[in-house]
């Protein structure tokens, strides 16, 4: 699998075992990819993906150590609603627990597992381009006191 910019620069590459489903994540980025056309190559198949401009409004804001605000992005026509998810990690960033946030409630974190050292809140927006699901995510990860 290879994802390349319109100029041909490799942005993401991975060896995938033959399967009906595969998932590949980019490294955490300090800045998002630019909007535009990208090329995804899966085996002998090459397809264009249109990546939209990232939101100029943060989806997650922290006003104090305990107070977080979620601004769910608008849902494009024909797409699933965005979702938010709490995750807890140990000191090695091994996932300990994950829980989806109810969109109608304040995003207060659930009780952290005793060995948790980090908590993370993510807002994820998904869209399909053919059979390919493209996710854009904003994440805030903070230490647990």
Predicted regions and their residues:
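Long, low-complexity serine/threonine/glycine- and acidic-rich segments characteristic of extracellular
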Residues: 91-119
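Edge beta-strands of extracellular beta-sandwich domains
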Residues: 13-14, 45-55, 127-145
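Short, aromatic- and glycine-rich surface loops/edge beta-strands on solvent-exposed regions
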Residues: 34-44, 114-138
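Extended low-complexity, serine/threonine- and proline-enriched intrinsically disordered segments
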Residues: 1-11, 80-98
């Amino acid at each position: 699998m290879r994802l390349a910019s319109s100029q041909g620069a490799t942005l993401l590459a991975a060896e995938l075992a033959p399967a009906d489903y595969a998932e590949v994540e980019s490294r955490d980025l300090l800045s998002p990819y630019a909007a535009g056309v990208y090329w995804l190559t899966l085996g002998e198949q090459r397809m264009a993906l249109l990546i939209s401009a990232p939101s100029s409004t943060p989806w997650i804001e922290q006003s104090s150590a305990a107070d977080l605000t979620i601004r769910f992005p608008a849902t494009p026509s024909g797409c699933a609603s965005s979702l938010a998810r709490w995750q807890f990690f140990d000191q090695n960033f091994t996932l300990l627990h994950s829980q989806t946030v109810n969109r109608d409630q304040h995003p207060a974190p659930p009780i952290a597992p005793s060995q948790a050292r980090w908590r993370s809140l993510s807002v994820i927006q998904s869209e399909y381009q053919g059979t390919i699901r493209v996710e854009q995510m904003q994440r805030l990860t903070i230490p647990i006191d």
